[in-house]
């Protein structure tokens, strides 16, 4: 009793619940320790009850002493205990006895509920305080739009994450039964955060749409002229967007800015108006695209720039390569103007290799830009056809090499060939087919058969190939060298075909070995030819046209300008791809090459397009591509008659693939029905039946989708395997001027096969097709610099000097051992550039590096690699001198006069 009595005198503010708890338990123990004989005594019973009640009360007192107790909770306690008392928030001198007198142990469950509610409410209260503190400090991040003072707003990534987390927290608080006291405040925060989220989304969409449309509507006179109402509408939107963005930025605080009165409704209205402008612009551009379908493959910004500057053709020239794939620019007549004060286009410049081709006749750039760009395209095709008709005649009148190197008359007799490279290849292909078929006619001649005609044809082709190889060893300009190298590639393939037919004893042109080859012909088309009435202006006087026959497919040559670039080395695998692909096109289907990476799926498709002179666009598919973009591509392909090669098509998401089935089926059905117009995505467009679609796939790779069955049925599959590297090496060596190409190709392939198997597995090692091509280019350079040196030595030097920079030290012994085995007794010295090495030495001294021989060699090797590579990795352990290596080379180049900057 003394303990309880003394406890009652303790001030509530100074009460220590732990001490009380320990003291009360000691009292209980002391009472229990009394002798059993006193337990029947009334005093014992009273003391025992008092101590137990006190023990049961102490935990409740601890709960009531918590900081979470507010006046509302003390008032609730008064109601539960039905006793009136002055709570501690009113009476700072309240004693513990005042609380003990409430007999809390009799209401323990109610007291615990009150205290639990107080604790939960405190948690909500603290969360609200944290929300206020956090959102009072969150401000906008800003980038200025182009060179203006218009702010483009965004939130920091961590602030956006806080927004999402806080929205979930507020939802959780509203779901709590303890939120009643804070209901209005929490609901207000829910509204605030929802506004922040909505406004943030609107700001992102508005900024994206506005910044896309602003240069088009404000900066494009064409849009203002063609869409006056929408241009006026956008002017108002432009003012509103800038005002709202500047206001939000001036407020700084995200919460305050996003919760301005009426802001959300104003943003909704702005977004609606922007969508109207965007739709009008899209409809306008689609109208222009329908007039000149190649505009489907240009971005809207580029297209509007073209349309805006259409009356000034000089300003449109920078977009030439986006409209005509292999054309860099047009040459305009600076002296004479048309009746509309426009220039004439007199020639075009190749974007692939080096070549200029003069229009026949020159083209007046009159009218709307979409009209005269179509006229330019037609004029290109007509010019190529005119060149073909002359080239076919000239081929019969000159020796082959004279015809090949024949130049135009003044003013550029030394630069421009009389025929574009594309026409030279076409003429060669036409005459090769004619010569082989003439050999077959000689074999089967009824009165005077010549069974050796095909062998004689082979001998003639071998000599022609040797002549071309010898021609590469003479001094040629870049344009002529490229042309001759491509001719060698084509001639080598032609020779291999005739060798195969001789080996198989082929005696007739109807044999499959011959029918399965791409055969270029210049003749009057037979009745079973495809598109027999197409392009009557591209016919000879007797109705002849250039066409390609393979098996039962006969298609016209399309005269798309290809430039003066390299062509693919054709292997037996390529021939099989050509047969399947052309059969698919003949059946009005698409084609689907599938196989591992690096096997030539895309390149074979592009080369087939080159053989047929078709415009071929390559699209890299990704999961981000949507059905609208894909629909525009199909519209462009269908109406322009172009080919589309969709790389890694199975990376598209299943939803897009499903829509693609409908889109491409509309094209296929239109081609089969010989329709002049088709409907894709509710748009009616013209249909050119020579269009084609190719999809390449890497089966079994991660992240790939399964094609819908309906889509599979529209494409003919082709399985593509690893190409014949030996044959590719042989052809490329011949093109570089090597006469012992067959032997050297076998050694080359053997070396790379052994290196792949025997050297350590390093991430930077590459013994594939790309590495092969790079070494052959180096070997060709050595051959031209030292034509009298043994060819084995030249190739060995290229293999050694190109590969040794990337070989790690532990592999060097194996590498040199294999080189020695394949090229015994051959060890040509490294090609030295004394001038470069002197500049490297001076650069080392200027940078404070010790110019030892090994370091200087690495710098020189880096320079040699950069001559044939766009990018080089400099690898090695820390402190090996990687940075100093490239810095020294940059300094050496600057000393040499080639100013080199680095960042």
Language-model regions, residue ranges each:
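Extended amphipathic alpha-helical elements
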Residues: 1-557, 565
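Alpha-helical lid/collar subdomain of P-loop NTPases
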Residues: 420, 427-431, 435-438, 446-447, ...
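Dynamic helix-loop-helix/coil hinge segments at AAA+ ATPase domain boundaries and subdomain interfaces
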Residues: 559-575, 622, 839-855
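Phosphate-binding P-loop
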Residues: 573-574, 582-588, 853-855, 862-869, ...
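Walker A/P-loop
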Residues: 586-618, 635-636, 871-902
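Loop/turn-to-beta-strand initiation segments
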Residues: 588-590, 615, 640-644, 688-694, ...
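Conserved alpha-helical scaffold flanking the Walker A/P-loop in AAA+ ATPase domains
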Residues: 625-646, 679-686, 863
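Conserved catalytic/switch belt of AAA+ P-loop NTPases
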Residues: 635, 650-687, 692, 698-701, ...
């Amino acid at each position: 009793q003394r303990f309880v009595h003394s406890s009652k005198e303790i001030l509530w503010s100074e009460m220590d619940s732990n001490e009380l708890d320990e003291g009360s338990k000691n009292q209980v123990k002391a009472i229990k320790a009394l002798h059993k004989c006193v337990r029947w005594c009334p005093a014992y019973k009273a003391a025992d009850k008092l101590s137990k009640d006190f023990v049961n009360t102490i935990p409740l007192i601890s709960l009531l002493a918590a900081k979470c107790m507010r006046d509302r909770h003390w008032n609730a306690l008064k109601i539960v205990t039905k006793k009136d008392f002055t709570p501690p928030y009113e009476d700072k001198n309240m004693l513990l006895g005042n609380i003990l007198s409430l007999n809390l142990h009799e209401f323990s469950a109610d007291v615990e509920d009150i205290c639990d509610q107080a604790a939960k409410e405190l948690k909500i209260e603290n969360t609200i305080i944290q929300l206020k503190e956090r959102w009072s400090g969150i401000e906008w991040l800003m980038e200025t739009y182009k060179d203006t003072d218009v702010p483009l707003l965004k939130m920091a990534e961590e602030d956006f994450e806080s927004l999402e987390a806080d929205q979930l927290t507020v939802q959780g608080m509203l779901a709590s039964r303890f939120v009643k006291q804070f209901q209005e405040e929490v609901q207000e925060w829910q509204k605030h955060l929802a506004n922040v989220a909505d406004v943030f989304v609107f700001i992102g969409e508005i900024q994206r749409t506005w910044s896309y449309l602003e240069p088009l509507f404000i900066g494009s006179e064409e849009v203002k002229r063609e869409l006056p109402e929408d241009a006026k509408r956008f002017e108002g939107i432009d003012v509103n967007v800038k005002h709202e963005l500047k206001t939000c930025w001036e407020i700084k605080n995200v919460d305050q800015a996003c919760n301005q009165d009426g802001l959300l409704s104003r943003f909704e209205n702005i977004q609606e108006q922007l969508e109207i402008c965007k739709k009008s612009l899209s409809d306008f551009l689609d109208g222009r695209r329908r007039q000149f379908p190649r505009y489907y493959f240009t971005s809207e910004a580029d297209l509007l720039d073209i349309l805006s500057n259409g009356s000034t053709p000089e300003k449109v020239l920078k977009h030439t390569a986006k409209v005509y794939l292999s054309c860099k620019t047009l040459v305009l007549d600076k002296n004479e103007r048309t009746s509309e004060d426009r220039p004439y286009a007199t020639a075009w410049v190749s974007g692939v290799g080096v070549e200029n081709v003069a229009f026949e006749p020159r083209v007046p750039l009159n009218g709307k830009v979409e009209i005269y760009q179509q006229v330019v395209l037609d004029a290109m095709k007509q010019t190529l056809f005119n060149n073909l008709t002359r080239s076919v005649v000239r081929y019969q009148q000159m020796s082959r090499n004279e015809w090949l190197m024949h130049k135009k008359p003044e003013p550029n007799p030394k630069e421009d060939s009389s025929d574009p490279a594309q026409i030279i290849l076409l003429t060669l292909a036409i005459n090769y087919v004619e010569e082989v078929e003439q050999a077959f006619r000689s074999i089967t001649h009824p009165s005077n058969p010549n069974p050796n005609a095909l062998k004689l044809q082979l001998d003639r082709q071998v000599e022609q190939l040797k002549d071309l190889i010898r021609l590469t060893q003479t001094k040629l300009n870049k344009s002529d060298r490229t042309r001759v190298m491509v001719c060698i590639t084509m001639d080598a393939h032609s020779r291999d075909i005739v060798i195969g037919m001789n080996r198989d004893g082929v005696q007739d042109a109807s044999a499959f070995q011959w029918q399965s080859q791409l055969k270029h012909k210049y003749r009057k088309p037979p009745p079973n030819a495809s598109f027999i009435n197409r392009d009557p202006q591209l016919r000879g006087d007797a109705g002849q046209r250039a066409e390609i026959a393979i098996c039962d497919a006969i298609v016209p040559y399309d005269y798309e300008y290809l430039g003066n670039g390299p062509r693919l080395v054709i292997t037996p695998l390529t021939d099989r791809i050509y047969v399947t692909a052309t059969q698919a096109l003949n059946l009005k289907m698409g084609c689907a090459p599938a196989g591992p990476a690096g096997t030539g799926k895309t390149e074979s498709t592009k080369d087939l397009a080159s053989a047929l002179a078709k415009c071929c666009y390559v699209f890299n598919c990704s999961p981000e591509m949507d059905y609208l973009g894909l629909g525009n591509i199909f519209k462009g392909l269908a109406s322009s008659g172009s080919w589309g090669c969709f790389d890694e098509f199975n990376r598209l998401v299943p939803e897009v693939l499903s829509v693609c089935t409908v889109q491409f089926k509309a094209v296929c059905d239109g081609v089969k029905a010989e329709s002049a117009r088709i409907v894709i995505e509710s748009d009616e467009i013209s249909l050119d039946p020579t269009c084609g679609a190719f999809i390449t796939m890497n089966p079994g790779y991660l992240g790939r989708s399964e094609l819908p069955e309906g889509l599979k049925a529209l494409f003919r599959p082709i399985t593509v395997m690893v190409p014949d590297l030996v044959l590719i090496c042989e052809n490329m060596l011949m093109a570089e001027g090597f006469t012992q190409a067959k032997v050297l190709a076998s050694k080359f392939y053997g070396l790379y096969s052994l290196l792949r198997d025997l050297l350590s597995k390093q991430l930077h090692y590459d013994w594939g097709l790309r590495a092969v091509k790079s070494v052959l280019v180096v070997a060709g350079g050595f051959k031209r610099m030292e034509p009298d040196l043994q060819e084995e030595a030249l190739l060995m030097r290229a293999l050694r000097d190109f590969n040794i920079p990337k070989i790690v030290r532990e592999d060097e012994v194996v590498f040199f051992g294999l080189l020695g085995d394949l090229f015994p007794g051959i060890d040509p010295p490294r090609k030295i550039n004394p001038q470069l090495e002197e500049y490297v030495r001076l650069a080392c001294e200027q940078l404070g590096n010790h110019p030892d021989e090994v370091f200087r060699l690495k710098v020189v090797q880096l320079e040699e690699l950069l001559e044939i590579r766009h990018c080089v990795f400099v690898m090695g352990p820390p402190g090996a001198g990687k940075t100093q290596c490239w810095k020294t080379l940059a300094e050496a180049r600057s000393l040499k006069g080639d100013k080199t900057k680095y960042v």
